[in-house]
Amino acid sequence: MSHNTFGHLFRVTTWGESHGPALGCVVDGCPPGLRFKLEDLQVWLDKRKPGQSRFVTQRREDDLVKVLSGVMLDADGETMTSTGTPISMLIENTDQRSKDYGEIARQYRPGHADFTYDLKYGIRDYRGGGRSSARETAARVAAGGIARLVVPGVTVRGALVQIGKHKIDRRNWDWDQVGQNPFFSPDAAIVPVWEEYLDGIRKAGSSIGAVVEVVAEGVPAGLGAPIYAKLDQDIASLLMSINAVKGVEIGNGFAAAETSGEDNADEMRMGNDGTPIFLSNNAGGILGGISTGQPVVARFAVKPTSSILTERQSIDADGKNVDVRTKGRHDPCVGIRAVPIGEAMVACAIADHYLRDRGQTGRLK
């Protein structure tokens, strides 16, 4: 299987499977001299790890990251400094239950990659989906922790803005609320609504989709390039690579189809300090594939988890019709834990474009 690497200068390769002994990543192209502690990476993995509420999978993984290479340890025994060589990181799997998947070893679960993997490779890891499992994204989040260190002054934050048909009230948006509830919601008022709604979904053994929004602030103007190296193009590509993501929009996104040119185009004026300012941000901080200096805004839609208790019609590897009922521990709404994953992907895209811009123009933005 190829295509396990993304990025041009900031390059990330992930490896490992859901029920293997471990998974991890190699970050190549990280500049030397970046100083950080293990906790600077672990904080993001803790945000993604399973078992933190009744609304996510009850698989228990500590997701403790180990840095194996690419750094030198300071005298304090905690602070690491990147050397410019590949940074390899490892996360052990400790709570696999492969026996839960024995009955589907030859059955194709509806909505999963079982059929397409078998069709393409002639073999698949049925234990939790193997490489196609969202478990792989733990390695991406670790890489995103490194990416956040690359571009000075950039803050990447994500939030859940919709579960099923229940959307947040954007007038209530408060970033301080995101870490105060199990949904990463910026709207405190929607939390009890989501709790009641997801409890019903969970008890029924079903699942539901969601929408995640990621905002990157402090992104320097000038990142990205036309025509085939657009910043929004690469952000969309990386977000689409996340398991269960079926749609991505930048800025106004699909709402632009309902908007007039007068309302959609972001007007400009000169600020009091003599620098240009935008009067709106419908473009999501990117014009012509190049960052404007405004916040970069991306949203992505996550489909309902395909692993549900409801019996579904399918076929098996022998070409027989079967009824499939998925066992194991699964997220009733995978969109919740997709928030830190989306953050990591956007951070990696921005870090890559920052290094590419620096290499092409020589500017330290």
Curated annotation (Swiss-Prot):
Cysteine pairs bridged by disulfides in the record: none
EC numbers: 4.2.3.5
GO CC annotations, alphabetized: cytosol
One protein family per Pfam: Chorismate_synt
Cofactor(s) named in the record: FMNH2
Matching InterPro entries: Chorismate_synth, Chorismate_synth_AroC_sf, Chorismate_synthase_CS
Cofactor: binding details: Reduced FMN (FMNH(2)).
Highest rank taxon of the organism: Bacteria
Broad enzyme group: lyase
Any one Gene Ontology molecular-function term assigned to this protein's record: chorismate synthase activity
Binding positions for FMN per the UniProt entry: 131-133, 243-244, 288, 303-307, 329
Keyword Cell membrane tagged: no
Coiled-coil region: none
Quaternary structure (record): Homotetramer.
Family in the record: Belongs to the chorismate synthase family.
UniProt name for this protein: Chorismate synthase
Protein's organism: Rhizobium etli (strain CIAT 652)
